[in-house]
């Protein structure tokens, strides 16, 4: 099992990916303890001195002007968690819940939240024991933070709600007992610290980013395979073309294509002196389109990595000055906009792949048998597989609609502008699945096309990509049940079968 020492505010993208993919044993670096304790001492001083501070001894939202008596402060925090656990929809899977929990721990341990070390350690214990709170997927608008999802997470700490332990849904109290853990009682400020934050939104978008990286790599490999299958030119990948424009994403994308295609291959030599002057855009403009997508991936990475290490609580405790200040770090607009831009990239990766599939279907453009199968008429070949790819590409166009431009006021107009970041991030998962399906069809089609160039081979790396598929999916000599082959290729893509053929590009 992966073991990780968490130094608050210093999580890397690779660490976040590992948390998402695998269970983790987490420990908090000792450097965080003094800051955590200082913020708690500041909160305790405010209570002891009878000062009024939002979230510590007041109500919440529109009720922020209501002063809460000291004897009700503990009940205030518990009531906050219970009342805000109002999510709906299917439960998030363990991987997503684990990522949200680690992001929450990372934020709280920065020492600006006034939450005791013992509560943070209780969250760490949930992660280490594999106790996963039941968090419904829907119910947050991304301001004031992800209240409902984080309330459902926090229920388990209190021994309320449900949690999954060793694959079984149990009452949280029972799950804690089986894992050898005890519920906690929250002190002043702690319920609000647990609930306020962008951790669900950020986790949703991070999953989208992780999947987009795999899709980008897979599409580059399949685009290179298609270039070979239809006897496309290597000239559009010439480094001088891309240096002249100066777009770094484009320059780097072209380099990836050159890495795969190398200088030549038996296929390339076979049409070295052909009559074609230019290839269609779906081949010739791959560096330009994929480079623009790569730029979006990199910008999204920058935003999400900053947010993963951010303090998005409210109010914030500045212990050195003895102050508690209300602000708006819970507003997930940066995450929403990043997710919107990532959606455009995922849609375009799939759209370009679908156009290359369509190109291979047309015998006049591809110089291959119609629909990539011999004895056409009796055999339909890839005819409907291309239709499936077109359907998926079209779905993604609607899903790519920006969420960050939408807003509905909540909390009696106190919270009058919200980000919709959770929905912006969550739809990326469906878009990624659609695009992976498109690329799977292209992989099948491109390998079939190269097979049909009998006796000719591609570059070593592209032959490796073809062999990886052919170990699981046979060449099409005649029509057969097609869906299992798409499913097989899709599974291989999700496992990173093609991504590993490329150097790091992020």
Swiss-Prot record:
GO molecular function, one term: histidine ammonia-lyase activity
Enzyme class: lyase
Gene3D superfamilies: Fumarase/aspartase (Central domain) (1.20.200.10), Fumarase/aspartase (N-terminal domain) (1.10.275.10)
InterPro entries: Aromatic_Lyase, Fumarase/histidase_N, HutH, L-Aspartase-like, Phe/His_NH3-lyase_AS
Keyword Repeat on entry: no
Chief localization: cytoplasm
Post-translational modification: Contains an active site 4-methylidene-imidazol-5-one (MIO), which is formed autocatalytically by cyclization and dehydration of residues Ala-Ser-Gly.
Entry's Gene Ontology cellular component terms: cytoplasm
Reactions mediated catalytically: L-histidine = trans-urocanate + NH4(+)
Similarity comment: Belongs to the PAL/histidase family.
Name recorded for this polypeptide: Histidine ammonia-lyase
Species for this entry: Salmonella paratyphi A (strain AKU_12601)
Taxonomic path: Bacteria, Pseudomonadati, Pseudomonadota, Gammaproteobacteria, Enterobacterales
């Amino acid at each position: 099992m992966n073991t990780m020492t968490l130094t608050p505010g210093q999580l890397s993208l690779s660490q976040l990916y590992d948390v998402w993919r695998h269970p983790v044993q987490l420990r908090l670096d000792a450097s965080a303890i003094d800051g955590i304790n200082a913020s708690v001492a500041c909160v305790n001083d405010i209570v002891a001195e009878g000062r009024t501070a939002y979230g510590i001894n007041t109500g919440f939202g529109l009720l922020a002007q209501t002063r809460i008596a000291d004897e009700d402060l503990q009940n205030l925090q518990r009531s906050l968690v219970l009342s805000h656990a109002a999510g709906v929809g299917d439960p998030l899977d363990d991987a997503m819940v684990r990522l949200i929990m680690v992001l929450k721990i990372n934020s709280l341990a920065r020492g600006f939240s006034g939450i005791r070390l013992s509560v943070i350690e209780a969250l760490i214990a949930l992660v280490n024991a594999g106790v996963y709170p039941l968090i419904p997927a829907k119910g947050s608008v991304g301001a004031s933070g992800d209240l409902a999802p984080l309330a459902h997470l926090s229920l388990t700490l209190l021994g309320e709600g449900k949690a999954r332990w060793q694959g079984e849904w149990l009452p949280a109290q029972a799950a804690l007992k089986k894992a050898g853990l005890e519920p906690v009682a929250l002190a002043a400020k702690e319920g609000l610290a647990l609930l306020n934050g962008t951790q669900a939104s950020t986790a949703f978008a991070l999953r989208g980013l992780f999947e987009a990286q795999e899709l980008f790599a897979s599409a580059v490999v399949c685009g290179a395979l298609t270039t070979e299958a239809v006897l496309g030119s290597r000239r559009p990948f010439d480094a001088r073309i891309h240096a002249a424009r100066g777009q770094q994403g484009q320059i780097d994308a072209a380099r990836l294509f050159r890495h795969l295609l190398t200088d030549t291959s038996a296929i390339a030599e076979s049409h070295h002196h052909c009559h074609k002057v230019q290839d269609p855009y779906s081949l010739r403009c791959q560096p330009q389109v994929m480079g623009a997508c790569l730029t979006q991936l990199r910008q999204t990475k920058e935003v999400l990595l900053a947010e993963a290490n951010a303090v998005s609580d409210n109010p914030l405790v500045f212990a050195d000055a003895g102050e508690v200040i209300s602000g708006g770090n819970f507003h997930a607009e940066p995450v929403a906009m990043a997710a919107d831009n990532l959606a455009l990239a995922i849609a375009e990766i799939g759209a370009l792949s679908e156009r290359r599939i369509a190109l291979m279907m047309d015998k006049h453009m591809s110089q291959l048998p119609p629909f990539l199968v011999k004895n056409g008429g009796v055999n339909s070949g890839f005819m409907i597989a291309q239709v499936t790819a077109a359907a998926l590409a079209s779905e993604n166009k609607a899903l790519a609609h920006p969420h960050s431009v939408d807003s509905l006021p909540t909390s009696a107009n106190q919270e009058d502008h919200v980000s919709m970041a959770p929905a912006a991030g969550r739809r990326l998962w469906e878009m990624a699945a659609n695009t992976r399906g498109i690329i799977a069809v292209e992989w099948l089609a491109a390998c079939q096309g190269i097979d049909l160039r009998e006796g000719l081979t591609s570059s070593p790396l592209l032959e490796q990509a073809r062999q990886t598929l052919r170990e699981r999916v046979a060449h099409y000599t005649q029509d057969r049940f097609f869906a299992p082959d798409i499913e097989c290729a899709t599974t291989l893509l999700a496992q990173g079968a093609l991504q590993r053929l490329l150097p790091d590009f992020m």
